[in-house]
Amino acid sequence: MIFIDACLKKPTPYTPVWMMRQAGRYLPEYMAVRAKAGDFLSLCKDYKKASEVTLQPVEILGVDAAILFSDILVVPLEMGMDLRFEKGEGPVFTKPLRDEAALDALSIERSVKSLAYVYDTIKLTRENLAKDKALIGFCGAPWTIATYMIEGGGSKNYAVCKKMLYENPEFLHQILEKVTQALILYIKEQIKAGVNAVQIFDSWAAALEEQAYFEFGFSYINKIVDSVKAEFPDIPVIVFPKGISGYLDKISGKFDVFGVDWSTPIELAKEKLSPRYVLQGNMEPTRLYSKKAIDEGVDKILSTMRGAPHIFNLGHGILPDVPVENAKYFIKEVQRKSAR
């Protein structure tokens, strides 16, 4: 698998490429399956349909890896929190996690068992995915998941979380520890079900200043990485802490690949982290609106990363209104221009 070879710094015939959110709303085929499922969570829980949309970008675009179709918040959902997706406002937890009784009510054991639909999606996808294509599993980072659980949904300033961080840091650590233990078991079950690599998404890493991030954020990512690597040393682990270009000097851990978001100059990431880690990224997603912009973005990143271990990706998820033709063009151009 070219993607796995790249994760492990082995030579590849070209730079492998995939896109975050590649199974998504820009594809008419995805929208057709989602309409049949009824809503987003129903699609996540229907393993046959979830597998179908996981495979679509491989079949339609020719990406080098499929990424499991699911959501980072299925873990707190199956731990016992009430989650719904509201049109226009995203995920909402009807009873945010604010006290020890609510934390005690959440069950790690229940979550691992109740997420069987995810493992079934993985098994079915791996059966139908070409042998040379990797399947990436994933989870959210503990900090990012905790922000949703505590705030009750998305947030502009994370005021409730930060108040807790400064007023009751021990309780925030208790939440993060419990979420981390659930995620460790979840990722290990994904690997047993057949994923070839895993990615940890820390979408809201930039909400914390440097010292707080390494105490309440990255340290918990490394707990997951250490536990996974102890049991599955050959499974590549990708970390994607978004928006922390100022903290790169402090990044270390047993992971294999560091995902670079589009706001971080890839030259800076290369200087600080390569060749210790394979870099993944980091084209600005809106470049996909224009083939000329795609050409410029691809050329610049390939030129910067020439000779260094690299996986091509966007610096964040593909947007819902990107023309499919442009997404195809992007994938093909990366594969063509990076051919050794």
Swiss-Prot record:
Site features described as Transition state stabilizer, chain residue numbers: D71
EC numbers for this chain: 4.1.1.37
InterPro entries (UniProt xref): UROD/MetE-like_sf, Uroporphyrinogen_deCO2ase_HemE, Uroporphyrinogen_deCOase
Catalytic activity: uroporphyrinogen III + 4 H(+) = coproporphyrinogen III + 4 CO2
Keywords tagged on the record: Cytoplasm, Decarboxylase, Lyase, Porphyrin biosynthesis
EC category: lyase
Subcellular location(s) per record: Cytoplasm
Main location: cytoplasm
One of the protein's GO biological processes: protoporphyrinogen IX biosynthetic process from glutamate
Record keyword Ribosomal protein present: no
Pathway(s) annotated for this protein in UniProt: Porphyrin-containing compound metabolism; protoporphyrin-IX biosynthesis; coproporphyrinogen-III from 5-aminolevulinate: step 4/4
Keyword Transcription regulation assigned: no
Entry's Gene Ontology cellular component terms: cytosol
Function in brief: Catalyzes the decarboxylation of four acetate groups of uroporphyrinogen-III to yield coproporphyrinogen-III.
Subunit and interaction comment: Homodimer.
HAMAP family in the cross-refs: URO_D (MF_00218)
PANTHER family: METHYLTETRAHYDROFOLATE:HOMOCYSTEINE METHYLTRANSFERASE RELATED, UROPORPHYRINOGEN DECARBOXYLASE
Protein name according to UniProt: Uroporphyrinogen decarboxylase
Protein source organism: Campylobacter concisus (strain 13826)
